[in-house]
Amino acid sequence: MKDDFDDEEKFVPIDYDSENCPGETAEGRFGPDAILLVGFTPTEKRVVREMLNDMGADFIDLITCTKEMYEKMTLKECMEEKQEGKEVFSVAGMKTKIVIMSGMIGAEVVSVVDAFHESQFKDSAPAFACAVPNSWEKPIKQTVEEISGDHEEAMKDRGSAR
């Protein structure tokens, strides 16, 4: 496993055949079977839930990052939050929608990302990230800001490469 994970290494390739956490940062799966949505509306959350159900991933907990979670919780606490049956509203004012996946191996992550790209989100795809040991105890606010900044930087780089 990668014990020497570099904080500056923002993007790592996902090994489709690996049975480990993406980026090989943990042996096996890391974290609960969950997806944290940041910046999604309740309607969009329902669309994502239907998409996961259609993929046979109805066992994955789908969590919406609320303002309280954003301001007070770590990534770990957010991923362990139970919201069944609650109509929750996401953090307002987010420039970039973010999908943070937990408990998945490479092929599963790729399947989720592909499903988003084939859905109504294809023209405004969110930023995708995976929960890894390096960010597990960080405040979710810090993690979201880092992901959002990295995503904006990557989009600028992609735009200038064309």
Q: Language-model segments: which ranges?
A:
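Short acidic DE-rich linear segments
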Residues: M1-D6, A154-R162
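N-terminal, charge-rich interaction modules
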Residues: K2-E80
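Short, flexible, solvent-exposed loop/turn segments with mixed acidic/basic and small polar residues
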Residues: N20-R29, K86-A92, H117-Q120
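Glycine-rich, often proline-containing surface loops adjacent to acidic residues and nearby aromatics
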Residues: F30-I35, A92-I98, S124
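Helix-rich interaction surfaces within compact, conserved domain-sized segments
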Residues: R46, M104-S160
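A cross-kingdom feature marking solvent-exposed beta-strand/loop segments within repeated
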Residues: D54, I60, C65-K86, A115, ...
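Short, solvent-exposed interaction modules
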Residues: Q83-A115
